[in-house]
Amino acid sequence: MTKDLYIALHIAAKEGQEEVAGILIEHNAEMSAATKKGFTPLHLAAKYGNMKVAKLLIAKDAPVDAEGKNGVTPLHVAVHYDNQNVAMLLLDKNASPHACAKNGYTPLHISAKKNQLDIAKTLLDYGAKVDAESKAGFSPLHLAGQEGHMEIASLLIKQGAAVNAKAKNGLTPIHLCAQENKVEVAELLVDNGADCDAETKAGYTPLHVASHFGQMAMVRFLLEHGVRVDVQNELGYSPLHQVGGHIDFQYCGINIVLALLNIVLNIGETFVMKLNTQYLNVG
């Protein structure tokens, strides 16, 4: 046994040594033995895409849903490393597509985040829940939106994913598009009924978020779709207040201010006067 608690069968699984693995199993090697990370030999076969060893381990009744220390199963690992054949094998052998890691991520969350379209299709074919929630309340569509993965987002929506799903803090997929400037996915979401004025629990709209992070393309997109520019969060901040928080103001902040003011000036003096009062109230 190594310092990381690898036994010989772990190493055979990692290296794809089917014959060696078979001999070790015949001599009663422990197929449920866990490394420091809680990985069984099947986890390692899944990680390194060693199909023959994975088949052998499963044929010898290795636990297909064994959990590592962070709750990941061999299926989570196969999906994370884009080893589709091993993922298919595990699903065929009744590995759960609903298994949740400690952060609540299912294999479908991982495929959505990593843009693994074929594996996502396979997981859905095996009954993966399209709106499964992580511990923070994020769905696979949240993650696809955040990463800008258009094809995955489209697949999830076609399978019935909720475009206005709210995480525990109230963030929707379009909020995450706004944060990361993923306009293409935002367009897809809006075309399928996403609310451009959705508010988080703290009252932040996608426009607040896009303005805060200096995402000019998303600001333009949201303004073109008629979002409210006068909305205030629970602290009384408008999208205009958010500009410059964490961005290079000279690079894009001025353009965002001008775009917002252009709209603000068309909705009357009341809001502008309120902004002026808030900016002057420094004492």
State the predicted function of each range:
Residues 11-17, 44-50, 77-83, 110-116, ...:
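Ankyrin repeat A-helix N-terminal signature
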Residues 22-29, 56-62, 88-95, 121-128, ...:
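Ankyrin repeat domain, specifically the short helix-to-loop turn at the C-terminus of the second helix
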